[in-house]
């Protein structure tokens, strides 16, 4: 009559641990697949790469109480309409270049990185580029030769010359334009775009 209750037995807890771990792993796999479907290019919150062919803005939505990306009419990057594959390759070059040049050692992207230099999440839309007509040319010149085309945005901090080629600069700009189209739940907050009316 000295029988151990089921809940107090070692085998019960071993089996419970195995089932709980297996269940948690299964839930993790399902959530991962769900997240990937929602954060892949071409989804509702992350537009397809060919969005670089469109005008992109960032406007406050009173109903949602946050700023949202607004995709408008055609506004071709560097005067060219890119196919989805060409756009993907150009954005991919820009992403790989920002990784290779360690841009996040000074900048943030989507809130990740360092806060020494400006956040790049909506850099394509930044008022510091003066006008939409001048933006592409100014960005290319700045990325290739930041010392002679300095954009300090009032901080007096200057970007070092990272020996970025013209093609890499165009890739970075495509990447930044694509990034500005991503729905970031209103981040960065209180951001005023180059298109904003005073």
Question: Which role fits each region the language model picked out?
Answer:
Residues 33-44:
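Juxtamembrane/interface segments at transmembrane-helix termini
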Residues 17-34:
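Hydrophobic membrane-insertion alpha-helices, especially the h-region
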Residues 1-18:
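N-terminal positive-inside, membrane-proximal cytosolic segments immediately preceding the first
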Residues 62-99, 128:
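Electrostatic cytochrome c docking/interface patches
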Residues 88-89, 110-115, 122-186, 198:
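Extracytoplasmic electron-transfer domains, predominantly the class I c-type cytochrome c fold
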Residues 94, 100-110, 172-176:
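The canonical Cys-X-X-Cys-His
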Residues 190-198:
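Post-kinase regulatory C-tail/linker adjacent to protein kinase catalytic domains
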Residues 45-64:
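Short extracytoplasmic/periplasmic juxtamembrane "stem" segments immediately C-terminal to an N-terminal membrane anchor
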């Amino acid at each position: 009559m000295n029988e151990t209750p089921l809940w107090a037995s070692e085998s019960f807890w071993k089996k419970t641990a195995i089932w709980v771990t297996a269940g948690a792993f299964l839930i993790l796999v399902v959530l991962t697949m769900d997240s990937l479907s929602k954060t892949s290019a071409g989804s509702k919150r992350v537009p397809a790469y060919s969005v670089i062919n469109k005008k992109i803005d960032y406007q406050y939505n009173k109903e949602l109480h946050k700023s949202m990306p607004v995709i408008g009419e055609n506004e071709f990057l560097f005067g060219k309409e890119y196919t989805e594959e060409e756009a993907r390759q150009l954005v991919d070059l820009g992403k790989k270049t920002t990784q290779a040049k360690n841009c996040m050692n000074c900048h943030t992207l989507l809130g990740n990185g360092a806060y020494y230099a400006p956040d790049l999440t909506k850099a394509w839309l930044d008022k510091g580029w003066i006008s939409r007509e001048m933006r592409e040319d100014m960005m290319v010149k700045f990325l290739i030769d930041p010392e002679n085309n300095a954009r300090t945005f009032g901080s007096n901090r200057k970007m070092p010359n990272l020996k970025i080629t013209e093609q890499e600069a165009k890739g970075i700009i495509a990447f930044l334009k694509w990034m500005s189209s991503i729905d970031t739940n209103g981040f960065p907050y209180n951001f005023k775009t180059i298109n904003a009316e005073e």
